[in-house]
C-alpha cells in the first residue's frame, strides 16, 4: 500500500523520479537537456526546497520560477503541449509513488502552478 507524502525524503523521491521521466521524455526532455542545459546537481535541491515549501510551508525556497520560465520561453517558445506533458508526468509520478491528502494536494498545486505559468507565458507570446 502506498503512503502519503509526509516529509522532505518523500519530496526528494517524488521530484527525483519525476525529473528522471522529464529527462527521458520526447515532448519536453529536450527543453531541459539541450535548451536549458539543466545542471541537475544544482537544480534538484532547489526543486526539493520549492516543493517542500509548496506542500509543507517550510519557507526554504526563495526563488522566482516565473522569471526563469519567461527567460526560457524567449529561447524556445513554450506551448500548451509542453505544459500538459509536464502536468501528465508529474501526476503520473505522484500516483505511482504516493496516495493520500498531500499527494492530492501536490497534484492540485502542480496544476495550479502550470496553469498560472501557461497564462502568463503564452499571453506574453501574443503581445
Positions of PLM-derived features:
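Core of compact, soluble alpha-helical bundle domains
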Residues: 1-127
Amino acid at each position: 500500500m502506498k503512503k502519503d507524502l509526509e516529509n522532505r525524503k518523500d519530496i526528494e523521491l517524488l521530484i527525483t523520479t519525476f525529473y528522471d521521466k522529464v529527462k527521458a521524455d520526447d515532448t519536453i526532455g529536450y527543453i531541459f537537456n539541450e535548451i536549458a542545459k539543466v545542471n541537475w546537481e544544482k537544480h534538484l535541491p532547489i526543486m526539493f526546497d520549492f516543493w517542500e515549501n509548496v506542500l509543507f510551508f517550510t519557507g526554504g525556497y526563495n526563488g522566482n520560477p516565473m522569471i526563469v520560465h519567461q527567460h526560457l520561453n524567449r529561447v524556445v517558445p513554450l506551448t500548451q503541449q509542453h505544459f500538459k506533458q509536464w502536468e501528465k508526468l508529474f501526476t503520473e509520478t505522484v500516483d505511482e509513488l504516493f496516495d493520500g491528502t498531500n499527494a492530492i494536494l501536490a497534484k492540485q498545486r502542480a496544476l495550479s502552478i502550470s496553469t498560472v505559468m501557461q497564462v502568463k507565458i503564452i499571453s506574453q507570446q501574443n503581445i
